[in-house]
């Protein structure tokens, strides 16, 4: 079938970006994620609580968290909420170097941009009082109060942009701003209080969703703690200090760490963790419903392509059912991996149907990335072999690091029991097979 034009359109339908709320391509994975449902786990607490709440949401990178949060935001907008959603890693933070103040400034910026009903003067007053010490770093001269409110508000975007992109200026800005973060929280809460009074009654409850924070890279500090501990535990009082509902995403390696009970005590609830799609059971048997859901994801993306609505997965798109199954199996139930593998597969062809050889080449390409992320020098292949056999990841830093890199995946079965397995892209590697022989002999 000569399908070059439509193949390009199908390729673009698998753009690995979060789906907006209500997108027809959305697939409901709750039944194969152990019943995990953000509308219940996160949404009910926000909706029912008369006092501001602060919750944490986590999961593997690319596992579908942003899509679920966008769905939650849309749902709560129908229930009387004004929702300020932003992905902090897009414009506000550098995930390789983040401090609490960066997150606070990002929240401030997006609240100012979205909530137009409230008077920004308390926050702009804080900015005015700080501008003398910031002007040399920002390289911008502002005359207060002559400068328009819009121009003053825009300075917060410029501050977060410099913190994100300019390493030297990032350090300077933090040194100048960190002593005044409590004052900023106070000003921000004045703004929030007025917003609640001025917002229309049908949306006068306020929720901030700070996405993208789960991507913050792990950095061990001199005192033996980590930057993750510093941001989400040490600075928790500040993260919780906004007088509105807040949801922060967080690194999965911290959510599943020995600090989990501390997080529950601090935030009043355990972090909600989005598991992988269960495409096989713990004992290794394929789970048909999970595989069907992965096929549904593929079909929903293809159906959205004009002219491809009638294409059958197992006849027109893939050469046979076995080739389709291979693509799904090699993802381990990781949604973004499936989307990216589909694009990789299409790269090797100029027409449909997609051949097994193309899927194998796509798998090989992604496998190289995963293999290179395993550090043989610290015996990580041996750790992976242990998880491959036992189907559980012990709770220590070595295994949590592998979870963060998605070399180990977390699942939740129908009984609510957590289990782990290594990413299937690593299963056939020579290094893993050697490590398995070392354990079993």
Q: Where are the regions a protein language model picked out?
A:
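P-loop NTPase nucleotide-binding core
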Residues: 53-54, 59-204
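Walker A/P-loop-proximal flanking segment of P-loop NTPase domains
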Residues: 1-76, 80
């Amino acid at each position: 079938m000569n399908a070059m034009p439509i193949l390009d359109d199908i390729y673009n339908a698998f753009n690995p970006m979060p789906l907006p709320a209500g997108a027809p391509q959305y697939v409901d994975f709750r039944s194969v994620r152990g019943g995990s449902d953000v509308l219940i786990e996160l949404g009910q607490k926000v909706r029912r609580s008369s006092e501001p709440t602060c919750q944490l949401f986590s999961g593997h990178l690319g596992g579908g968290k942003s899509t679920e949060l966008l769905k939650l935001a849309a749902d709560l907008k129908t229930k009387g909420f004004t929702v300020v959603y932003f992905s902090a890693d897009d414009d506000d933070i550098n995930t390789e170097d983040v401090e609490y103040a960066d997150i606070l400034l990002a929240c401030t910026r997006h609240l100012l941009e979205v909530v137009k009903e409230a008077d920004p003067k308390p926050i702009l007053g804080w900015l005015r009082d700080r501008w003398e010490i910031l002007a040399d770093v920002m390289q911008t001269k502002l005359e207060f109060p002559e400068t328009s409110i819009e121009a003053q508000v825009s300075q917060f975007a410029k501050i977060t942009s410099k913190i994100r992109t300019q390493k030297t200026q990032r350090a300077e800005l933090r040194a100048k701003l960190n002593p005044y973060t409590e004052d900023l929280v106070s000003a921000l809460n004045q703004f929030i209080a007025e917003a609640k009074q001025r917002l229309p009654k049908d949306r006068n409850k306020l929720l901030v969703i700070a996405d993208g924070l789960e991507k913050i890279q792990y950095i061990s500090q001199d005192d033996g703690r980590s930057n993750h501990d510093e941001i989400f535990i040490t600075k928790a009082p500040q993260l919780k200090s906004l007088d509105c509902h807040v949801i922060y995403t967080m690194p999965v390696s911290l959510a599943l760490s020995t600090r989990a009970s501390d997080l529950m005590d601090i935030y009043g609830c355990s972090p909600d963790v989005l598991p992988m799609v269960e495409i096989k059971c713990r004992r290794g048997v394929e789970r048909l419903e999970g595989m069907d859901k992965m096929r549904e994801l593929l079909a929903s993306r293809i159906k959205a392509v004009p002219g491809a609505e009638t294409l059958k997965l197992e006849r027109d798109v893939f050469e046979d059912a076995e080739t389709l199954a291979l693509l799904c199996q090699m993802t381990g139930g990781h949604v973004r991996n499936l989307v990216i593998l589909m694009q990789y597969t299409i790269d090797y062809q100029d027409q449909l149907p997609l051949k097994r050889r193309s899927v194998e080449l796509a798998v090989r390409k992604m496998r190289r990335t995963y293999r290179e992320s395993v550090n043989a020098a610290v015996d990580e292949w041996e750790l992976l072999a242990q998880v491959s056999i036992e189907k559980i990841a012990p709770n220590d830093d070595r295994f949590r690091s592998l979870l963060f890199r998605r070399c180990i995946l977390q699942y939740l079965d129908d009984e609510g029991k957590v289990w782990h397995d290594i990413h299937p892209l690593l299963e056939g590697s020579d290094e893993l097979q050697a490590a398995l022989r070392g354990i079993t002999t």
